[in-house]
Amino acid sequence: MDDDLTEYAPDIPDNVLELIFSYLKLQDLRNCALVCKSWHRFLSDENNEVWRAQCMQKLSPDAFKTDLLSVVPTYKAKLRAFFHAWNPYDCSRHVYIKPNGFTLHRNPVAQSTDGSRGKIGFQHGRHAWEVRWEGPLGTVAVVGIATKDAAIQCHGYYALLGADDQSWGWNLVDNLLLHNGDAHGIYPLLNNAPKYKVGERIRVILDCDDNTLSFEKNYEFLGVAFTDLPDKVFYPTVAAVYGNTEISMVYLGPPLDG
């Protein structure tokens, strides 16, 4: 930015900044936040008109017609969740992403296990996202993580997520942890652990610093599920077998401890 403009940047009124920033792309907004403290302060308000406008431009009106985004209360957080949502180009051919951008629908195809990955993978930091299953689970309903090398569709009804060394999953049907084709015990470690009920909120917590994967159900921490994860890029992933089942995923950002 020109030195003369930088000198006067802190003195630009908020209403003028709002007008200027409303014409910028997201990457430009990120750069603007680095110009001066005043601009950083303005853009740190995740509910201001600039973020609202960006949110309305990028998200479908269908995304606001449900309570899915209630877990990400600010406009900037909703926008971030959209960019982390299911990838329509990285899912089984029997799956399509609904107009809201956050929910996948598995078509009623017999003898097929079908999955989907999120748009963005993680190799560093701590990340959390919420998964909600709508419709019957069938014999396989697995939630977890996978690399780009993991299969996303296979013939038959099979615990695809966790079937190889590139994926880790929790089968909500029988509460088994799955990796590399093996069951790694019941989860959570409770006597007669309750089964997942359709509509309950599952929170997936990936800690790339400690190399662990954990889960919460209805805001109750269930414990660490997997440890010693390799240094790879992991994507939010699910695998399903039941026809017309729908699975929503909302990225939350870093998990809140406590």
Curated annotation (Swiss-Prot):
Residues 6-54 form the F-box domain. SUPFAM superfamilies: Concanavalin A-like lectins/glucanases, F-box domain. Keywords: Neurogenesis, Synapse, Ubl conjugation pathway. InterPro entries: B30.2/SPRY, B30.2/SPRY_sf, ConA-like_dom_sf, F-box-like_dom_sf, F-box_dom, FBXO45-Fsn/SPSB_families, SPRY_dom, SPRY_FBXO45. Pathway: Protein modification; protein ubiquitination. It holds the Pfam family F-box-like. One of its GO terms (biological process) is proteasome-mediated ubiquitin-dependent protein catabolic process. The keyword NAD does not apply. It is found in: Synapse. Residues 64-256 form the B30.2/SPRY domain. GO terms for cellular component: neuromuscular junction; SCF ubiquitin ligase complex. The keyword Signal does not apply. Gene3D superfamilies: 1.20.1280.50, 2.60.120.920. Belongs to the FBXO45/Fsn family. Component of an E3 ubiquitin ligase complex composed of hiw and Fsn. Required in the presynaptic motoneuron to down-regulate the levels of wnd and restrain synaptic terminal growth at the neuromuscular junction (NMJ). PANTHER family: F-BOX_SPRY DOMAIN-CONTAINING PROTEIN 1, SPRY DOMAIN CONTAINING SOCS BOX PROTEIN. This is F-box/SPRY domain-containing protein 1. It comes from Culex quinquefasciatus (Southern house mosquito). The lineage of its organism: Eukaryota, Metazoa, Ecdysozoa, Arthropoda, Hexapoda.
